[in-house]
Amino acid sequence: MGRRSRGRRLQQQQRPEDAEDGAEGGGKRGEAGWEGGYPEIVKENKLFEHYYQELKIVPEGEWGQFMDALREPLPATLRITGYKSHAKEILHCLKNKYFKELEDLEVDGQKVEVPQPLSWYPEELAWHTNLSRKILRKSPHLEKFHQFLVSETESGNISRQEAVSMIPPLLLNVRPHHKILDMCAAPGSKTTQLIEMLHADMNVPFPEGFVIANDVDNKRCYLLVHQAKRLSSPCIMVVNHDASSIPRLQIDVDGRKEILFYDRILCDVPCSGDGTMRKNIDVWKKWTTLNSLQLHGLQLRIATRGAEQLAEGGRMVYSTCSLNPIEDEAVIASLLEKSEGALELADVSNELPGLKWMPGITQWKVMTKDGQWFTDWDAVPHSRHTQIRPTMFPPKDPEKLQAMHLERCLRILPHHQNTGGFFVAVLVKKSSMPWNKRQPKLQGKSAETRESTQLSPADLTEGKPTDPSKLESPSFTGTGDTEIAHATEDLENNGSKKDGVCGPPPSKKMKLFGFKEDPFVFIPEDDPLFPPIEKFYALDPSFPRMNLLTRTTEGKKRQLYMVSKELRNVLLNNSEKMKVINTGIKVWCRNNSGEEFDCAFRLAQEGIYTLYPFINSRIITVSMEDVKILLTQENPFFRKLSSETYSQAKDLAKGSIVLKYEPDSANPDALQCPIVLCGWRGKASIRTFVPKNERLHYLRMMGLEVLGEKKKEGVILTNESAASTGQPDNDVTEGQRAGEPNSPDAEEANSPDVTAGCDPAGVHPPR
């Protein structure tokens, strides 16, 4: 197995953050849940204690506190999505309702700690508590709070995320115009933070920046897609590559092809994860120094690749959930040394006031798994050279070491603020990397060939094939080395010498990937599909129709998606280089009966906040009481709504509509954030097409208590809340009472186009 393949395997295996909180033992799962079968793991590891005491990463006199903290369960933390206009309303709801109910509450004799804000996270948008998932699930006193967390998490308004993992995105200092690469993104909690920062201004539907989120594990990429979809952004692309050889992309700039350099790069590399001992209990028995020794090379390759793709003046954050200097300072020191001044560590000591951290260390030793220590490379016997590398040791030259300013690195210790262990370093790029300084400018096709065939010395030194004669197999399908494949194709197309190449015949293209996703097909300007949509919704002339795409090349287009202009540029110029898993948000869905209503496509709730600024018709302004009725009843008659809403609805033809609630600043008791909903104007009624969890979110924000049971009539309210809105009758639906057994409402609800994301809140559609 080659080094690159081994690296991919290590990236997939070393994922400590996936462990369930508090999973301390194994066993068989019965009706009552996971039950015993294995002895509980003893939270002791003498080698671990010996190693870190010798390295002195913990201040003198604090070792006992450090170990005690590691043996305690990790507090639960949650983060409120900051870019959404509803963030203040959620925070108000949490502080004044749910948190107050937790005061003086005890569960199994343990006093429940009222959640407290993280002192260093801006605007009180992150909170922590001693409530574990186990307690939240089993305690009836916490049922409402648990349902709130589950529902709001699914809606994208709240994220369950470990406190220390929130730090790297904050230190990236992202602005809406930044091009961002997240190199090892799954499961996606940090990625969602980056998306939030791009959309800091909710009035701008398409910020200039974007996030390309990459992960080496194909299955985990779909977890990443699920996380990103909760935020409904047109500026996120999920790709599947080996981070250590992620392809260099190109973009079109005024008709010329130029290399894409990123303004911000998050390099949260795979690690041994000994900082996660509080939640990943297996680390106690499995920890050895061998894990760090094996991962060091991969971490350095990923960091180097990130530095190559960083724009001058850009910022890269390198982070691990490990306390080991072999994975931390050693990687940074080696990267700084090989950069020859192109990179420098930024001083971020004042950027997160309230965060407690220890400065990076400048001296460390290397220990083998059997406890043998080495202070420098010269002392390592030849038999150990495959396991221990010279880059694992600190630089010998004291002046060079001092110039690196390794003390600017941040190491977070668990006992200082009741968190996990973590390491962060912020790097700024001052100039091109030494091996990239003579990079040719790209001009047309010949320049593409030159760029693709000139690989960096980093590729050479890390044992990667750099010319076609070194490719091992005609069916090479590596998940990241697409530059090599591109170079091979160019050489073949140009008739260059190919002696010794074990490749396909010249008439065939090299296979880049093992399999392909559905294509991303942009809708051409002259497509007859768009004019009826444009007319029906009176779209603004500024609407970027060129950014619409579908996922099929044949048959009827059932879903229309949208990406930002910048991501469109990336997609069009790199379709053969990238393995794209997902991008874009759904904005329109085909309605089977749409032709009867002048437009075959209805609006999708997923993309309504992106689309709404461009829509000039089919908009009904509703009151807060109207919103309550629309979200708690399936097909309320016009007469159940306010007279203002009725007068607007009666003048509209049947079909898809936008329902807009504007807050009333004169009424402080009313909901103070705007709401935009997708709906359908039927013959005599209106219905909404809003996912269940999103419905529950809006109802909670309006002060309605929602229960979690699924009943035939849909969302169930408490008696007190139901009295304020009126319950729908249980015997027949509104559509049947209106004499519409085959109404468009019913056909729409039963249409196969109605996906889970657009389905009303778990209700049975009218038949």
UniProtKB/Swiss-Prot annotation:
Residues 1-36, 436-481, 719-767 are annotated as: Disordered. It is an enzyme of class 2 (transferase). Its EC number is 2.1.1.-, 2.1.1.203. The modification N6-acetyllysine is found at K586. There is a cross-link at K46, K464, K470, K511, K516, K586, K640, K654, K660 (Glycyl lysine isopeptide (Lys-Gly) (interchain with G-Cter in SUMO2)). Residues 719-730 have a biased composition (Polar residues). Expressed in adult and fetal brain and in lymphoblastoid cells. One of its GO terms (biological process) is in utero embryonic development. GO terms for molecular function: mRNA (cytidine-5-)-methyltransferase activity; RNA binding; tRNA (cytidine-5-)-methyltransferase activity; tRNA binding. The modification Phosphothreonine is found at T718. Inhibited by magnesium ions. Coiled coil: none annotated. The modification Phosphoserine is found at S139, S456, S473, S593, S724, S743, S751. Keywords: Acetylation, Cell cycle, Cell division, Cytoplasm, Cytoskeleton, Differentiation, Disease variant, Intellectual disability, Isopeptide bond, Methyltransferase, Mitochondrion, Mitosis, Nucleus, Phosphoprotein, RNA-binding, S-adenosyl-L-methionine, Secreted, Spermatogenesis, Transferase, tRNA processing, tRNA-binding, Ubl conjugation. It is found in: Nucleus, Nucleolus; Cytoplasm; Mitochondrion; Cytoplasm, Cytoskeleton, Spindle. Changing S139A: Induces a constitutive association with NPM1. InterPro entries: MeTrfase_RsmB-F_NOP2_cat, MeTrfase_RsmB-F_NOP2_dom, RCMT, RCMT_NCL1, SAM-dependent_MTases_sf. It catalyses: cytidine(48) in tRNA + S-adenosyl-L-methionine = 5-methylcytidine(48) in tRNA + S-adenosyl-L-homocysteine + H(+); cytidine(49) in tRNA + S-adenosyl-L-methionine = 5-methylcytidine(49) in tRNA + S-adenosyl-L-homocysteine + H(+); cytidine(50) in tRNA + S-adenosyl-L-methionine = 5-methylcytidine(50) in tRNA + S-adenosyl-L-homocysteine + H(+); cytidine(34) in tRNA precursor + S-adenosyl-L-methionine = 5-methylcytidine(34) in tRNA precursor + S-adenosyl-L-homocysteine + H(+). The modification N6-malonyllysine is found at K586. It is linked to Intellectual developmental disorder, autosomal recessive 5: A disorder characterized by significantly below average general intellectual functioning associated with impairments in adaptive behavior and manifested during the developmental period. RNA cytosine C(5)-methyltransferase that methylates cytosine to 5-methylcytosine (m5C) in various RNAs, such as tRNAs, mRNAs and some long non-coding RNAs (lncRNAs). Involved in various processes, such as epidermal stem cell differentiation, testis differentiation and maternal to zygotic transition during early development: acts by increasing protein synthesis; cytosine C(5)-methylation promoting tRNA stability and preventing mRNA decay. Belongs to the class I-like SAM-binding methyltransferase superfamily. RsmB/NOP family. TRM4 subfamily. This is RNA cytosine C(5)-methyltransferase NSUN2.
